Amino acid sequence: MRHKISLLLFLAACLRVAVAQVESLPPPVVNGNSFEIISNSRYSSHSGFSSALSDTVLSNVLWAMSRVPSLDGSYREFYVATPSNVYLYDPANHVMNVHVAGDRRYRSYSAFEVGIAVERNEEAGLAVQAGLLAGDAFWSRGSGAVASCPMAFAANYANSHWSPNYTINMVDVFGRMSVSGLSDSCVAISSDSTLPRPVTDRADTFEVLLSWLEQDSAFDPAQLPFADVSQLLWAGYGVTPHMPTGKRGLTVPSAVANYYLTRKIYLVRDVGVDRYHNRLPPDTDMATSDHRLEAVTSGDRRDSLRAACPRLPATAPVYIVVCVGDAADDWTMLEPGFVGFQYLMQAHALGLRGRLTAPIAPDERAAIMAALGLPETDRPAIVFAVGEPAAAIVEPRRPENEWLQVARTKEGVRLNVRLAEPGTAKLVVYDLAGRPVRSWGSVRLPAGVHNFEWDGSGDNGTSLPSGPYFGRLYLARMQPSVLTARIDLAR
């Protein structure tokens, strides 16, 4: 009997240790700020932090970094250093598992530090940019308290002190600090009127856009409105009101404000190839602001580009080729990833589809340079294809008299749908991370109003936590469509 009690006590102790090894996180929240105003306002702070940031900020940052598309590497891991431990983040369950015990932060004053380990620096850049914007999304107009900076020295320290399974490419350092906050002031004004002024605040919401972020490879070949092209170019590498170290800041960070991609971004469309500029001629004064195009080659080079890199989507009307000077330099290769995230998010906000092609192999790189007439100093690192969604595979514009609405009830919520014509419908509720949590089987519905009751439980019958969710009603008919509505579940 004594042995049985000892065994039970031992197993209980093991269970307590196992439980202590897992740290739960609060669900991500929706801050309500647009992707554009956050991009226009962001800047990096290197010091002066305090360690007082809420777990909600950490939750949103980790969730955002894990939401970026993979570039088909064999591994991707997120490490978190707090004053307590170093953790390995589990995106599927949104929890942190203790990886190394004890305080191993690079900066003793930081609230937390997040490291990304992937095969390619381009993909690391995608995640780093997502995390930075997720922190800045907590700002308000004119003020903020979440400060951050990607630090290469922190990455070096992490690789020596965090015992990662794979080499950590970069570390985002976060802390609390008074910052200037959100601003929609536009400084990206073309000096020669070759590009219209971009919009620095829109009706979209950063977290909502990110929750549905995905890549596509089938496009309608119709040309894009030029205002959309201008918006994409600005979102990727456009100037902003901030002036770090006397240089005009951009929508993305750059190591020591070196701005490695200056004069190295090219727009490829039906009329020719243009170089994008964000500085006044001759592009050497980094304190200046511009937003213009310079013609490089005339005539349609898109087929030549597709032949040079057959992996590119074949029907995209527009390609943006992001080049670097040194494809072997880690800091340089992070920036195409920063820019790539911006392109994907801005395309999504505009109702467009996009796809990043990376990495670019050396033979593809040389072929692209020859096809587009690029100088030897500009080596393609990422190609972004963008266009309207192909009508054959995604929803067309739905009738104005069709909608999906949400109403609260005593038991939970009621999802009301109005159909202009009959169709087979399937309703799915997703959490903020884009995971399906409750679904109703496909049913044939006539035209008119229909109701779906939801008591807030998942498919397994477990009650789900309060917070934002999204309902999508998929309609299969001659013209398939998708109706979407936000659900605020309250307990």
Q: Which residues does each predicted region cover?
A:
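Short proline/glycine-enriched turn/loop motifs at strand-loop junctions of beta-rich domains
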Residues: 419-424
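A glycine-rich helix N-cap at a beta->alpha junction
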Residues: 159-182, 372-390
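C-terminal tail/sorting-segment detector
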Residues: 391-401, 406-416, 439, 443-447, ...
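Short, glycine-anchored, charge-dense loop/turn motifs used at functional sites
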Residues: 430-437, 469
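Sec/Tat signal peptide C-region and signal peptidase I cleavage site
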Residues: 15-20
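Small-aliphatic-rich amphipathic alpha-helix that forms the alpha element of a beta-alpha
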Residues: 42, 61, 78, 112-157, ...
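N-terminal amphipathic, basic helical "cap/leader" segment at the start of enzyme domains
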Residues: 21-114, 147, 155-156, 160, ...
